[in-house]
Design a protein with these regions (language model features):
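Short, cysteine/histidine-rich loop/knuckle motifs that typically chelate Zn2+
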Residues: 22
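Histidine-centered nuclease catalytic patch
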Residues: 1-19, 27-35, 39-42
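PEST-like low-complexity intrinsically disordered regions enriched in Ser/Thr/Pro and acidic residues
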Residues: 25-110
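A generic structural micro-environment signature
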Residues: 7-10, 49, 132
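C-terminal, charged low-complexity interaction regions
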Residues: 81-176
């Protein structure tokens, strides 16, 4: 959940918005840094929400075997390499630094221009989500990944090895 006013104790319907875990961390980049769950990349050719769908498929595909796992690892490497351009343009790829600058160091006039100035910068979701609870730290991501792959998850139990068949069927239907 995302809390529009930043107050996690305000559970009113006007304040609470449901989001996927990847979208939520875009709104709270400082938390993404705390959980070690995202880094900044330069990727102007892909919108943020589309990147989330791509990355989710990459992580599900990566834990399979065979060509789909190899392709997923290569795709992840390509995305991670885009960190360098973010560092070159912004001086950092760390989400918490971006959040701090936006929150504490720029004037209202510059803040109003953030969309234009940061066009092309994306928060790349990583394959970890470090949660602290009762003095313990654990990586929640394996559980999230297991859900995505489950019959109730967004991939509906469809194993990555079958994805090429789904794509080919969709392509044939689109062309007929």
């Amino acid at each position: 959940m995302f809390f529009r006013n930043g107050d996690r104790t305000d559970q009113s319907t006007k304040n609470v918005m449901t989001t996927c875990i990847f979208c939520a961390q875009v709104y709270e980049m400082d938390r993404a840094a705390e959980m070690k769950s995202g880094v900044l990349i330069w990727l102007p050719e892909i919108e943020q929400h589309v990147l989330h769908h791509i990355v989710r498929a990459i992580y599900v595909g990566r834990i399979s075997q065979g060509p789909m796992a190899d392709a997923s690892r290569r795709a992840q490497d390509v995305l991670l390499a885009r960190r360098e351009e973010a560092k070159r343009r912004l001086g950092t790829d760390e989400a918490n630094i971006m959040a701090m600058v936006l929150r504490d160091y720029i004037t209202p006039r510059h803040y109003a221009q953030r969309t234009e100035k940061l066009k092309g910068v994306r928060l790349l979701p990583l394959d970890r989500r470090i949660i602290q609870e009762s003095g313990l730290q654990f990586n929640q991501f394996p559980q999230i990944l297991a859900y995505w792959r489950s019959k109730d998850g967004p991939f509906g139990g469809k194993i990555p090895a079958q994805w090429i068949n789904f794509y080919q069927e969709a392509l044939m239907k689109a062309n007929s």
